[in-house]
Amino acid sequence: MSTPSLQRPLQRRTCRFGPQEWEVYDAWTPDAPRADVTVVLVHGGLWQTSFDRAHLRPLGLALARDGWSVASVEYTRVGMPRGGWPGTGTSVVAAIEAVATDPELPDRLVAVGHSAGGQLAVWAASDGRCPALTGVVSLAGVLDLRLADTDEVGSEAVRALLGGAPEQSPQAWADADPTLGRLDVPAVLLHGAADTLVPPSVSASYLRSRGPSDASCRLEILAACDHFGIIGPGHTAYGRVTAAINEVSTAAPAGAGPRA
């Protein structure tokens, strides 16, 4: 079991990337970072306003205590001005782009998204949307929106995000679903075997949708782990999260040739 360190001193800032009060990210910078990578956290909560970036604060602090530079982003959610699709997605891209230009953070970025944040992180890492990303880690991500809708994984929330059923908002469904995009950067999908809120089959479906033009992608099912244990710094899953960040930050992107 890997547990976070509590010794490393940190600098904390809250930075604005847009005019709205929620268009901010929290940045934690260790005094002695162990890698030239910034971990960009994207929280879940079914794209709703009931959850915000505070939900991932324990994970962000743990990663920073372990030597990672961390930026936990906020984004426009359903019910806010411009919330829904595509506003929620473009808000996440804007947040990641702001982190990439922050002079106090390493400019190699790995996105780590939980639940609905996994959908947003993988979507941002696809189809050339975020060139600054070098890797992505999905934690119990809602990576197949049609399957999530069919399995009633917050189906009303999926439809609220996309403006209705597939036949009512076909363009939004086509654009937002990660299964229909080309993955640009290496990805690790972590999913708890005991997750009853977003079953592992949702991540498995995304993995099956990958093709030869995609970057590397693998799925790891974590035993005795549920939907929220996967983001718990004290859970055995924490070591797998840090290992996945290490893995994708050093792997080659889609279309990359051999390293020199």
Regions found by a protein language model. Name each.
Residues 183, 189-191, 195:
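Short beta-strand/loop motif that positions the catalytic acidic residue
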Residues 196-205:
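Conserved alpha/beta-hydrolase "acid-adjacent" motif
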